Amino acid sequence: MPSVGSALVAMVSTKGGGLRRPLTSGALILALIGGVMAACGGDDDLGGDPMAADPAVILPAAAEAMGSVESVRFELERGGAPVFIDEVDSLAFDKAIGRVEVPGRADALLDVTVNGNLATQLGAVAFDGDTWLSNPITGDFEPLPAGYDIDPTLFFDPKGGWQPLIEGLQDVTFLGTEDKDGQRYHLRGTGPADQLEVVTARLVRNQDVVIDFWVHPVTGLVTAVEFDTDDDGAVSSWSLRLADYGERFDIEPPDLDG
C-alpha cells in the first residue's frame, strides 16, 4: 500500500487531467464538513443593537471579539494564479473547508490540484501538536509527510493572527451596511504582511494586502473576508467565510485502523 507521500508523488507523475479521485475510508468523515458551510446563512434578527457604524468603534470591537474565539467553521477558496502547499510546487491549493477548536485542534477537507491537471481532495486533522493527512488513493489517514505544510490549526489563530491583524489595519474605510449572509458592516483596509501570513496558514506571504471585511454589527465577529494577492504579476483572488462561532465540534484524532 503506498504511503501518503508516495501516493502524492505518483499522482504528480500522472499525465492527463479531469480525474477527481474519490474519498474513501476515514477521509469520508471530513467530507461531511463541506455540506454544513453552505447551509450557514444570515438571519434578519441580529440579536441586539448594532454598534455605531464607525471604524473607530467597529475595529476595537472586532479585534476583541476575534481574539476571544474558541471555535469556528471556515471556508477558504482561491481563484486565479495557483498557490502551492508543497516544497516542489506541484500541489496547488484550491479550497479548504474545516473546523477549528482553540487551542490546537482542527480538521479540514482540502481541494487541491496536482501537477496542474489532476483535481483531488485530502483530509487533514491536527490534534494537540500532531497532524495527519489522508492518503489520496486509500483515503486512510497517515502522519503528515515531510515537505507538506498542511496544519489545519493554522487556518484560525485568534490571539496570534486575527486580533493583531485587525489592530494593525491601515487606511481603514467604512463602505456601508450590506447583505453578506445577513446584514454586515463592510470595511476595507490594508493588512500587514506578517499577520496576513498567519491568518492564511502561510499561504500568503511577504506582501501587505488590501482586504475587504464584513463584520457582524452586534457581535463584532468577522464573517467574510476577500482580497487579492500579486506574486510577480500572477494575481490570486481569495475568499474566506467564517461561521458557527462557539460551536462544539468534538474534533478527535483520526482512526488510523481505518
Predicted feature residues:
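Subset-of-secretome marker
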Residues: 41-258
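C-terminal motif of bacterial Sec signal peptides marking the signal peptidase cleavage site
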Residues: 36-39
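Hydrophobic helical h-region of N-terminal Sec-dependent signal peptides
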Residues: 28, 32-33
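Bacterial N-terminal signal peptides that target proteins for export
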Residues: 4-27
